[in-house]
């Protein structure tokens, strides 16, 4: 037995254990379900774009102003699904401060609040497409995606006599590249964001102080801010926040400026 063990030790080559291969990330295809996020920082720099979103520009997608690096311009955008009195307060502040906003609306918001939509338009704000029904667009077929955009387009035209601005934002940031290809085909730029925070739950609102700190800590030149206009906190802090940011040298731009549409 000792002889056999000795022979085996000679015949079997000595080597280090083979290291396990690192796990590979699944390839992102046009049909991969994605959820928007960015890698924020506290140095007031444009957040880093995660690798899975590297194709964004190919689909006419935006999340921050990368065309004017370092310029202290901000973009206020609001996802408006319904009204609880605070959308009107937000509009009052924007009018008082002479600041433009972009409102991404649903069909329900338009049918329930036609006067507010007319006010947005008459006061120079951009009214944009947040889809007709606020579905998870990562699960939508090409045809369903197309209908979500065109149904709201048609309703908007019927109710206002105007065309909705060709800016699209996926509900809850859920999407797949196939969606954005359809949006691009229909003439839309897709607008994500570089800053958002937990402001949507009416029964779990952040305190005004905490909200201002969160925004100020994460602000950066070229930021696209996503705010929910139903938020009581947002309605309270917006006048102060605008003054604060303007005093720090920021100004507020429009989505046409962000995307370069006004320059075309």
Regions found by a protein language model. Give the residues of each.
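N-terminal pre-catalytic segment of deacetylase/amide-hydrolase enzymes
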Residues: 5-77, 83-96, 210, 241-244, ...
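Hydrophobic alpha-helix-in-membranes signature
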Residues: 12, 16, 165, 169-170, ...
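Metal-dependent polysaccharide deacetylase catalytic core of the NodB/CE4 family, i.e.
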Residues: 71-74, 84-86, 91, 95-209, ...
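Short catalytic/ligand-binding loop motif for oxyanion handling, primarily in non-cytosolic enzymes
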Residues: 175-178, 233-234, 261-263
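Catalytic grooves of carbohydrate-active enzymes
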Residues: 219-256
């Amino acid at each position: 037995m000792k002889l056999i063990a000795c022979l085996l030790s000679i015949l079997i080559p000595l080597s280090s254990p083979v290291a396990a291969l690192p796990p590979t990330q699944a390839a992102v295809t046009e049909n991969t379900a994605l959820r928007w996020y960015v890698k924020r920082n506290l140095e007031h720099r444009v957040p880093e774009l995660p690798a899975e979103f590297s194709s964004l520009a190919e689909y006419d997608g935006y999340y921050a102003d990368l065309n004017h690096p370092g310029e202290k311009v901000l973009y206020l955008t609001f996802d408006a699904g319904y009204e609880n009195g605070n959308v009107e307060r937000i509009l009052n502040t924007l009018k008082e401060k002479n600041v433009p906003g972009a409102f991404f609306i649903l069909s329900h918001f338009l049918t329930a609040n036609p006067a507010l939509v007319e006010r947005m338009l008459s006061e120079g704000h951009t009214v944009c497409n947040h889809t007709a029904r606020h579905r998870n667009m990562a699960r939508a077929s090409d045809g369903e995606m197309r209908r979500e955009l065109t149904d709201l387009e048609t309703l908007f035209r019927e109710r206002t006599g105007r065309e909705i601005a060709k800016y699209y934002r996926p509900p809850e940031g859920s999407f797949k590249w196939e969606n954005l290809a359809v949006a691009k085909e229909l003439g839309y730029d897709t607008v994500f964001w570089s800053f958002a925070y937990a402001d949507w739950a009416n029964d779990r609102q952040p305190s005004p102080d905490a909200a201002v700190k969160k925004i100020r800590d994460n602000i950066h030149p070229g930021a696209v801010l996503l705010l929910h206009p139903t938020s009581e906190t947002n309605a309270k802090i917006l006048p102060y926040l605008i003054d604060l940011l303007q005093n720090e040298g920021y100004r507020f731009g429009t989505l046409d400026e962000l995307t370069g549409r006004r320059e075309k």
